[in-house]
Amino acid sequence: MRTELTATGLAQRVEGPLLFLRRAVDVGVNEALKIIGGDGRTRLGRVATLEEDRMIVEVLESTAGLGVADTKIAVVGEPISMGLGPNLLGRIFDSVGRPLDGHPPVPAMRRLRIDGMSINPARRDLPRDFIETGVTAIDLMNSLVRGQKLPLFSAAGLPHDRLATAIAERARLRGDSEDRFAIVFVGIGVPHDTAESFRSAMETSGALGHTVMFLNLADESSAQRLLTPRFALTAAEYLAFVEDRHVLVIMTDMTNYCEALREVSASHGEIPGRKGFPGYMYSDLASIFERAGCLHDHAGTLTQLPVLTLPGDDIGHPIPDLTGYITEGQIVLDRDLNRRDVFPPINVLPSLSRLMDYGTGKGFTDADHPALSNQLFAAYANARRVRVLASVMGREGLSDTDRQYLEFGDRFEQDVVNQAAPRTLEESMALGWQTLALLPDAELTRLSNEQIGRYVRGRSRD
């Protein structure tokens, strides 16, 4: 770390959250700066762009009142970092890691760069083991595995904030590792009332005791928004790879992050890509999502559940499209289910957890879990097909088996997907077996005769 250097007379102009300076000092990209205004107020900034004769600094606080002639620049000589230490759980921070809960800063036993630890791919281990979210459509059908990155695709007006809060309150590990579990909850570009509802829900449920919260408000600068997930993931890496905890990071809403990235890119004068987003958005998102994982030489894990809203309900939009290339599946919310008061309105058919097989089945959840999940998928897909037939030819033209599928589809949505309270995996599986009892044995082709006799018909006779 270099000695802090102060320079004056470098500022040329201020545009939104950006400060344009003459390049008269030796700095690097992403290096931290202190910007001292004429009023004596110190603001944090970072070097965003370096050119031959100038540099652009992102100011991470409001630039209101920041002049040009009387602005001083203090060069810190290192990238932006976050001080971390014990007693991190239960704390609430703002966009850039400053306390919002009225308590003093966390005693810094260690300072970590917010752009993440450089992990040799050879050190990575295969994600495995099950995280119970309390949501049947996820736990039973699209299971979340420690070390996975599994996004939740929503749309404007759907209850993704409510679902994210519910998962943060309910999520847990099964077995002896439960006391090593932690949540990092990140609100990105959220309104004040939403941020307060997040905070109130976590405090009321008692989940705040094993949670760290980072809240970026909608009226804060775009530059701050770009740093919020990085500060949060730095705290998560400390919990996972220093304190050896199993950490679940819930980030909502990554669409707000990408919109901020487009805004900042445009203000830099960069050439836009698809729909105005910068061409490097893929690598930028990867620098966030790829911080999830497991390491051979650490007991802790870092799992991500990012939430994003589909602009215009378009799953082919660059934001969900690029996210899908990086992550390992998706959980998809559905407007039609939401209109029918199904909560959570998760459409299990387009949803997918690519790593589900590594955390479910014998030795992880239940030996019959994979078979039950496969049979429910197949049966519900048939039920949706029969609904289309019924809309064309009417119920009178359907066979008896098709009518049974119609009843199964309705019961599956109302009894299995829909839930008013958290469920354990055992409760979710019991509902799944019970719903399959509506179908004849000949249709249960994904189950063995033993499974049909023990779970499906045995339960239907109770």
Which residues fall in each region the model found?
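P-loop NTPase catalytic core
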Residues: 140-461
